[in-house]
Amino acid sequence: MSARAAPSRRRQAGRRLRYLPTGSFPFLLLLLLLCIQLGGGQKKKENLLAEKVEQLMEWSSRRSIFRMNGDKFRKFVKAPPRNYSMIVMFTALQPQRQCSVCRQANEEYQILANSWRYSSAFCNKLFFGMVDYDEGTDVFQQLNMNSAPTFMHFPSKGRPKRADTFDLQRIGFAAEQLAKWIADRTDVHIRVFRPPNYSGTIALALLVSLVGGLLYLRRNNLEFIYNKTGWAMVSLCIVFAMTSGQMWNHIRGPPYAHKNPHNGQVSYIHGSSQAQFVAESHIILVLNAAITMGMVLLNEAATSKGDVGKRRIICLVGLGLVVFFFSFLLSIFRSKYHGYPYSFLIK
């Protein structure tokens, strides 16, 4: 039974082949060539990706941050394929640019990149690069970037979003803040290791030695410890430092000022109420000190029992200090809190 059925099945298959349309053979051949081409293209992408990752790992083994010009930026950051994330700092480190903020940000960026490079979690999923304005002007123009320094995250898939640009003006550029931002964008957690800094210890030792030496020299007469004026001056210095935002600067690590790399204009006052510069803290400290001095002079003019003419001059000087510097302080407040309706003398 099975021997008779075998020739019958072969005859039926032959009939099906005879009735197969002749136009289908080119289609099958084209489909076969397309599959071969797709397979070859995928293999080519894999080889290209492997070459890029190998090159990036080689650069990372030499330096934790590698510098890029326009061609390298387009090849390793913008062009596919990519299965890695890139953190790029756009800066202007050349001396003629006179960007002190760029140098400070570069130091923090270097600390962060070194912490990642020498950590046990280091892998080929995250790399750190840098584009200097004088080495990649075309990159700045391509990204419509008009300020430096700027930190951007380029994800492995898709285009960078708004949150992929680090808010340096509000948060500052401390390595710890950058590490937190990177963790939010890439899920890569970097523990920052800072090199030992003994300047604080040395300063504290000098201060203790100075105070100890002063107490030793004045050991027979310690009445100065009970001097109200001295303690009042110390208290005022602490109050001025805290009200000017020095603690915020210590935590956030903002730049001293901001210099526009195109026109060279330097800004000492931040335009937002959510951030400030170090220079801004110094300005506020001086203004508060001047207003306080004016108030002290007014009090002195009212309570002293000296010459009336002299007291009147002291009163006018104190009033002038309070009026002028308070008006200046209020104008800075209005520039940061847009829409604040009140002003005094200076707008």
UniProtKB/Swiss-Prot annotation:
InterPro entries: OligosaccharylTrfase_OST3/OST6 (IPR021149), Thioredoxin-like_sf (IPR036249)
Disulphide-bonded residues: 99-102
Assembly and binders: Accessory component of the STT3B-containing form of the oligosaccharyltransferase (OST) complex. OST exists in two different complex forms which contain common core subunits RPN1, RPN2, OST48, OST4, DAD1 and TMEM258, either STT3A or STT3B as catalytic subunits, and form-specific accessory subunits. OST can form stable complexes with the Sec61 complex or with both the Sec61 and TRAP complexes. The association of TUSC3 or MAGT1 with the STT3B-containing complex seems to be mutually exclusvice.
Protein name: Dolichyl-diphosphooligosaccharide--protein glycosyltransferase subunit TUSC3
The keyword Magnesium belongs to this UniProt entry's keyword annotation: yes
Membrane topology value: Multi-pass membrane protein
SUPFAM superfamilies documented for this protein: Thioredoxin-like (SSF52833)
Gene that this polypeptide is encoded by: Tusc3
GO BP, one annotated term: magnesium ion transport
Topological domains, Lumenal: 42-196, 243-276, 334-347
CDD domains recorded: TRX_family
